[in-house]
Amino acid sequence: MELNFTKMHGLGNDFVFVDDFNKSIELSADQIAFLCDRHFGIGADGVILVRPSDRPECVAYMHYINSDGSLAEMCGNGVRCFTKYLVDHNYIDADAGSYIADTKRGPLPISFKLDANGLMSVASVDMDMPILDPEKIPTLLPASCTTNGESFVNEEVVPSPWGDLSFTCVSMGNPHAVCFLDNLDQLPAEWFTSSDKTLNSFDLERFGAYFESHKAFPAKTNVEFIVPADDGLHMRVFERGCGETLACGTGACASLVAAVLTGRSARTNKVHLRGGTLNITWQENNRVLMTGPAMQVFTGTIEI
């Protein structure tokens, strides 16, 4: 079967987009893995099928599949790219400036801006309210604090073979375990892949893979490691179902929420990822706003 596709990315978090408005495409886990393979396929962190929505207020439905074939509840960078795809392919009037996207989590209001060439370049996504209830995240870690009457998991210690780490848990439609590395120079040398103790040299592959599948997270989890700084929150992420990515929109939102809950950040801040920067605001109405770029890389046809 020949498949027409569009390769897109949001801060290096990249996706293979396939138009499935006829709802005629079903891809196996092996086919997804092939499309996402960076040596034998197109190369991506996941595949997004653009499908019609059953909701009259929504333009289209974003069906997101991780590179390992598992379904994802939500993807912040993906939904910005989804917006660009809809604008570029005339599913949305470029002058409209806003629309409502349908996702597995539900409808999300999105606004977007055009660049000097009339192309959509930046989108602001209303990512809905963070979920803090441990049972709904889900996590088996206990809630030890409350905010506005809602209990949340506040820096609970989780053991590992190499030492204990503390996690604050947030769901943005998908589960996140956020770990703050406040004093890198005080951490054990064996936690790093080089002699310089920086976020970039932190052994994310080892710790991310371990905690992603830890028994404390029955549905597995995305794992964020954060270094707070004067210029914002510096973040690396190990995504559930695909490993480290250059950026994670829901992870940036969850990390900002966790930083506010633990007193490390104001309600608006920049989150610096390996692929670039997102602007995140946890609004007073409890909804999280994410703003960042979306880019098309190339289009093509592939035999699967």
Please state what every model-predicted region is.
Residues 135-146, 299-304:
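Extended Gly/Ser/Thr-rich low-complexity repeat segments
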Residues 120-130:
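Membrane helix-loop-helix hairpins that form the core translocation module of multi-pass transporters
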Residues 1-121, 178-304:
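A glycine-rich beta-to-alpha transition motif near the start of alpha/beta enzyme domains, typified by
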Residues 170-172, 290:
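Active-site donor-nucleotide binding/catalytic segment of nucleotide-sugar enzymes
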